[in-house]
Amino acid sequence: MSEQNQPLLEVRNLSVEYQTDELLVKAVNNVSLSVNRRETIGLVGETGAGKTTLAMTMMGLLPKGIGKVTGGEVLFDGVNLLSLRNADMMAYRGKVLSMIFQDPMTSLNPVIPVGRQVAEVLELHNEKHLTKEQIDERVDEMFRLVGIPPERKTEFPHQFSGGMKQRVVIAISLACEPELLIADEPTTALDVTIQAQVLAMMTGLKEKLGTSMIMITHDLGIVAETCDKVAVMYAGEIVESGTVEDIFEGEKHHPYTEGLFGSIPRLDIETDRLQPIEGLIADPSNLPSGCHFHPRCPYATETCTCQAPPAVAEGEHVICCHRFAKGEQE
C-alpha cells in the first residue's frame, strides 16, 4: 500500500451526545470515516447535521460538562486521540492536527498583533528549538504563503478585511505544517470572489505542504472543486460516501443527496421556483425511528419507519438506504 493510500485518520463507530438541562441531544451517531495521507474529504450536510461536532471531537474540543463521547474511536496515525489526557492532546493540536473555524471575525484576538498570534503557535510547538529571529522569519514566510505582505504583521485584526483575516487564520493553522487540516466552513463569512481566492490558496498550500484535509461545508460546488472523496451527513449519521466521481457523476444516490442536488439552482434549466427538500431536519433530541430521513423522503415505505437502513456498497460508494438493499430503485 502506498503512503498516499494509508489512513492518516480513522473514525470508528463514533457517537457523541450533548446533555442540556432539559434535553439529551444525539449529535453524532455511529459515524465511521477515514482520511488518507494527502487526501481531501468533503463533509457535507445541512446545519445541524453534526459536522462541526464531529470535527470538534477529533480536535478534543468538546465543551466540558455538556459534550460526551458515548462510543467509538478517533485514531490518528494509529493513536486513539480520545484516550489522551488534555496535556498530551495539546502536543497534537496545532502541530499535527489543526483546524480553521467558521468565522474569521471571532477567531483572532483583537488586542494582539496578527504576527504575534502566528508566532505563538510556533513557540508553543517549538520542538526544533527555533530562535526568536527564526520564528520571525517563519512568520514572514507564512504571511507570504497566504498572500499578506510581511510588513503587516504588526497590525491588529480590525485593520484587516474579512478575507485577509481568514488568510491570517490559515497562516496560524498551517504554521507548524500539520499533517491534517480541518476546515469548518472556511469561506462562509466571505464574499463569493474572496471565497474563490481563499479556496484556490488553500488547495495550493495543501499540495505544497502535503497536508490531508477535511473540508466541512454545505456547498457542493466547493466539494466538487477541492475534494477527492465525499461523506454526506444527515441527523448525525453518514448516509452516503464515495469518491467525488461517485457522488457527482454516479446514477445512484441516497434520497437526501438527491435533495441536496435538486435544491441547487441551474442555469441551463428555466424554472420559477427552487426545489428545497421538504420538511425540517430531524431533531437530534428526538430522532425519528428507523431511517432518520423517512419523514422527508419521497420514497419512504413502512420498513423505513421502523428499521434502520443497511449500508449498501459498490466499491468505495456506500449508500445507507432500504431502496438499494431491496433493489427497488428505478
Functional labels for PLM-detected ranges:
Residues 5-7, 243-330:
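Short catalytic/signature loops enriched in Gly
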Residues 1-252, 319, 325-330:
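ABC transporter nucleotide-binding domains
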